[in-house]
């Protein structure tokens, strides 16, 4: 029995040590699993029609790309290919964590990709609509500077 427990303990340590979040920058994924930003197609946010309608496309499990230790889903193979060719052009700021939470020193708050906006040419995700509204009605540049400081502090601790 003690050999079984010891073996399970060693396996658990190996799994935790190999977890994607430990090696790469953190990415906003579901609590269980590695799907980024609620499975939304991060390339689709950049489409003019999506920006106008504010309705982002759901990604599908058949179009996936691994990046930063997370699984990014796409609505089409074309979107997956665009992302694979230039992921930095499509990954939301702070790798999809809530921009408002970072700007208010709340730390890393996961998002599901539903609440979002562009400030300048940058895509920001939010945990909830009040955070987005704060940025729309307030000084988004100042909020971004605060979020940037918090993000850099988090990255330096990793």
Where are the regions that the model predicts?
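Bacterial N-terminal signal peptides
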Residues: 8-18
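Charged, low-complexity intrinsically disordered segments
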Residues: 22-158
